[in-house]
Amino acid sequence: MRSNSILALSVLFFAATKAWDNTPPIPERVEGLGEGSGNLRIDFEVHYDLMCSASAALYPDFATFLDTPFLNGKVRDAVTVRYVFQPLTYHHATWIPHKLLPFIVDQCVANSTSCQYINYMNFCFNNQDDILGSTDKSFNQIVQNWTAKVAKQFGWNQKDLTDLFDYDTDTHNSEMRTRYMWKYSTSRGVTSTPSTFVNGIMVQNFPGSPDEWMQLLKDTYAGQQNGASFASHQFLQ
């Protein structure tokens, strides 16, 4: 009888600990992909919504900034960039273009030389009207139209893309991974797009020109130099 009581208490304890285990799902890899060599170990994490007009309008300035001469090369040689996406529900049907991203990430992981992650971002920015202007169409119609357009642009099989929208045929865990995108961005305190972080710190005012991006980089780099000078001074004391 005593052993039965101990067994029952053990089962109850195990059940209680499982009930209180609130560890969230852990994504299989760091959210987002990007570019840059990172020679100076300065990291830019940029959050966009593929259907956000401000994201589309301001991205070209950031692209120009990356190709701007800096030190002995270009900005992209000095920094690393990671593009992260936050599908904001007030942008009509924004979930649809974002749900293709897990498929694209997997393509990039399998073959980094043919990665279309950044090209797809550009494609979405340039074709926002196809999604945002489809208020007279059903969800399935938008999926069919968008996947046909994307498949033609990138040479992918349209069925591979439409399969992402059916739980029984999706092999990329697309729904959950799209939720991870939103959850990650939200957990970082992002409430609107575009937003950016430099070395993990959120920038309060998103830069509005290549010059503003460059000033942000120079300020960060100057901090590195001041830190190095301080460390050298301390070492020599």
Residue ranges and their predicted role:
Residues W20, I42-D49, Y59-D67, V143-Q237:
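C-terminal cap of thioredoxin/glutaredoxin-like
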Residues G32-E35, L71-N72, S185-S187:
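Short, flexible, glycine/charge-rich loop motifs used to bind or transfer phosphoryl groups or to couple energy/partner
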Residues L40, E45-A148, R188:
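Structural alpha/beta surface segment adjacent to cysteine/selenocysteine redox centers
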Residues S3-K18:
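Cleavable N-terminal signal peptides of Sec/SRP-targeted secreted and luminal proteins
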Residues W20-F44:
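A short beta-strand-turn-helix
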Residues P24-P27, S53, P87-L88, P194:
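Proline-rich low-complexity regions
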